[in-house]
Amino acid sequence: MATARVSLILLVVVLAASACAEGLRLPRDAKFPAAQAERLIRSLNLLPKEAGPTGAGDVPSVAPGELLERRVTLPGLPQGVGDLGHHAGYYRLPNTHDARMFYFLFESRGKKEDPVVIWLTGGPGCSSELAVFYENGPFTISNNMSLAWNKFGWDTISNIIFVDQPTGTGFSYSSDDRDTRHDETGVSNDLYSFLQVFFKKHPEFAKNDFFITGESYAGHYIPAFASRVHQGNKANEGIHINLKGFAIGNGLTDPAIQYKAYTDYALDMNLIKKSDYDRINKFIPPCEFAIKLCGTNGKASCMAAYMVCNSIFSSIMKLVGTKNYYDVRKECEGKLCYDFSNLEKFFGDKAVKEAIGVGDLEFVSCSTTVYQAMLTDWMRNLEVGIPALLEDGINVLIYAGEYDLICNWLGNSRWVHSMEWSGQKDFVSSHESPFVVDGAEAGVLKSHGPLSFLKVHNAGHMVPMDQPKASLEMLRRFTQGKLKEEWLAELPEQPMYAAM
């Protein structure tokens, strides 16, 4: 306890010195995280209008540990959808007071034997329905609220599950605040528990290959979740889950490395000047120090690290103004940088709510309550659990759109190259090759053994939205174990870019 107090005092001294050097006035009110939630929830996803879902109303009751699922036909669907297996459901989380996890299941448009893929949107606290209708789900929403087929939906080659998590996200809810999650242990245990009951209800999928995917803050969720699944398999807990790999898109995984890359990326993209670069870099040493304390001293240190390190990003944003930090080629339009308003309109429709079984629950794209609850988790390093998975043959794909600032490809590339595992030396020395889709280079791929890194061209933070065809092809090759093989005969090797 004494060591923790001394460390925090040292952190305050370092931060104060850095702030004085920069002329920065730090917020003094005790409600700083709440204020930050409104300003910075956008830094990994969207600004919500409400704290979280409200008004459970006539949501069907379900016993703890049980799953209640219904076959779904959404209003506005195109013709022919009745032949497919679309489901929505609630899982009543055991060992909680009242927590219910909402999910969609879209069976493959191909065959039942296709892999099972689970998708996790980041935030923390942002609904996976954002991905369902704007990224890689079966449909897109038009302005008149009708749905159109997404021909590049990931359900064309997989049985895909979209989950609202942690509790309080999207349509997942609890009437008891004690069910709010604050760390990856709680999040991953909930997801593992859900999978056990899901595969019990759907034994036809239990032996299929299983992959975990997601983006943004899922760079935290996914390594912990994959480790929990692998641990359960090794301990023969319940149903064996046939985990083959996981893919993280533009994720936040190793904050110490990724925050340090902000200024380098911003300078490389001509977003800031060299003088700005030198000035903002003065925040890096206190950020690194704060993250070290977070790894040893717990919640108070982690909150301090969040405040210190985000001064790097906020300083850059003061200079870039209205640039869309999810895609620096674009301007930020309105509060959200993207217009996802049709999603909340769609889920505000009574017929839609009745179809998916959520009663009168009010849908919120992103929850400030969940965001604030996870602030002490933000600066933790989730890379540390990945090497053990690689050593056991779990395939890992880290991909990143090249125009994203907030979880940029450079920071992701650096932590992947820095990761210590038995294949690190060979991975670092391996050559990069073009990722070719329909005869054109869609990205640059580097692979060795079970580890791959893909830099995706002409894409920002949300690769499936910006490059739907390339992202679908990426998933197909990854799940079929062909990510490395298929480009070998297409184009010759090209020079590597430097990994720093």
From Swiss-Prot:
- Gene coding for it: CBP3
Provide the protein name: Serine carboxypeptidase 3
Quaternary assembly: Monomer.
Give the PROSITE patterns listed for this entry: CARBOXYPEPT_SER_HIS, CARBOXYPEPT_SER_SER
Q: Name one GO molecular function term.
A: serine-type carboxypeptidase activity
Signal peptide location: 1-21
Q: Which InterPro entries match?
A: AB_hydrolase_fold, Peptidase_S10, Ser_caboxypep_his_AS, Ser_caboxypep_ser_AS
Q: Which Pfam families match?
A: Peptidase_S10
Q: Keyword annotations for this protein?
A: Carboxypeptidase, Disulfide bond, Glycoprotein, Hydrolase, Protease, Signal, Zymogen
Cited PANTHER family: SERINE CARBOXYPEPTIDASE-LIKE 48, SERINE PROTEASE FAMILY S10 SERINE CARBOXYPEPTIDASE
